[in-house]
From Swiss-Prot:
GO terms assigned for molecular function: cysteine-type endopeptidase inhibitor activity
Motif (Secondary area of contact): 68-72
Upper lineage: Eukaryota, Metazoa, Cnidaria, Scyphozoa, Semaeostomeae
Keyword Secreted listed: yes
Compartments reported by the entry: Secreted; Nematocyst
Source species: Cyanea capillata (Lion's mane jellyfish)
Bridged cysteine pairs (disulfide): C86-C97, C107-C128
Ranges for domain Cystatin: 35-109
Protein name per UniProt: Cystatin J
Record GO cellular component, one term: extracellular space
PANTHER family hit by this protein: CYSTATIN (PTHR46186:SF2)
Length: 131
């Protein structure tokens, strides 16, 4: 009954962005740019992908994202990644290397954020395609 009333209230006041538990909601461009949990999660996902694939990619654009309330927040983000022009050297900081602009990769990262656990972010899935 409570869920029915919540849905009815959301529909009656025209709230397209009403986030119900379990409901998947597409994030606006403004939300994507300002959501610290999402942006930190994207960094986490890219770092994990780089570690797993021995790559040196950096996120250059969050194309789209969705969020779902579960036991935490489940995010799915479509990210454009570009390689850095650096030799694989642990002494070289990736942020100082120039971007290689002609080889974008698009990845869909799904990760979970749970503020109450020690490891706040966990990867659920990764799918990447070189453009």
């Amino acid at each position: 009954m409570h869920l029915y009333l919540c849905v009815l209230v959301c529909l009656s006041i025209g709230m397209a962005n009403c986030l119900l538990p379990g409901g998947i909601r597409r994030m606006t461009d403004e939300e994507i740019q300002n959501d610290e949990i999402l942006l930190t999660g994207v960094e986490f996902a890219v770092d994990k992908y780089n570690s797993d694939t021995n790559s040196r990619l950096i996120a250059t654009n969050v194309i789209s994202a969705t969020v779902q309330v579960v036991a935490g927040f489940k995010y799915n983000a479509l990210i454009e990644l570009r390689p850095r022009l650096c030799v694989q050297d642990p002494k070289t900081k990736i942020a100082t290397c120039p971007l290689r602009m002609n080889l974008p990769t698009k990845c869909s990262f799904t990760f979970l954020y749970q503020s109450w656990v020690p490891q706040k972010y966990s990867m659920l899935s990764t799918k990447c395609l070189r453009a």
